[in-house]
């Protein structure tokens, strides 16, 4: 696993080992970042369920200004910290050990991100729960990028969000959510 493009291009990243680990493939990561390339410069990024931190680090390498990497696993946090240091992004990164829902519930309503990566363990209720919790935490022109199993059909609309597009890559799907128009006009 490596950073694909940007200032840290080619930097190898460590990953977690085990049956429960499912890092984003390079093909899927490249597709995600191709679709958001114009959103990255100076963006503030939230990577929930960060795992190795690769999505947040790829965003920083491509011009994001700050990344918050959230994971509950102590093993994941150790790998994330090593990857952050190896990529040279320690000053631009917050690494936080907590559960994603607890983090969003405790964050001040004024804390907002331009891009949110949501790649939870494949459980059918987690993405929808996180979308609802993210309601006040995404900038008006922000996006939520959800990686999930292809079989999971996410709703066209949920709370303040509407589905912009779903991309499929084999057994994996990526769904992008943005605010409904009436929300950004108020």
Put a short name on every predicted segment.
Residues 1-186:
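Class I S-adenosyl-L-methionine-dependent methyltransferase catalytic core
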């Amino acid at each position: 696993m490596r950073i694909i493009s940007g200032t840290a291009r080619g930097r190898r990243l460590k990953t977690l080992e085990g049956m429960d680990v499912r890092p984003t493939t390079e093909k899927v990561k490249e597709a995600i970042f191709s679709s958001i390339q114009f959103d990255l410069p100076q963006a503030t990024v939230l990577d929930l369920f960060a795992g190795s931190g690769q999505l947040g680090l790829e965003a920083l390498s491509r011009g994001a200004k700050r990344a918050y990497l959230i994971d509950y696993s102590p093993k994941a946090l150790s790998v994330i910290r090593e990857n952050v240091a190896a990529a040279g992004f320690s000053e631009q990164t917050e690494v936080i050990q907590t559960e994603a829902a607890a983090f969003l519930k405790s964050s001040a309503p004024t804390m907002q991100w331009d891009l949110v990566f949501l790649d939870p363990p494949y459980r059918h209720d987690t993405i929808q729960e996180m979308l609802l919790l993210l309601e006040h935490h995404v900038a008006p022109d922000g996006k939520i990028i959800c990686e999930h199993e292809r079989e999971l059909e996410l709703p066209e609309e949920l709370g303040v969000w509407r589905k912009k597009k779903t991309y499929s890559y084999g057994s994996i799907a990526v769904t992008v959510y943005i605010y409904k128009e009436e929300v950004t006009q108020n």
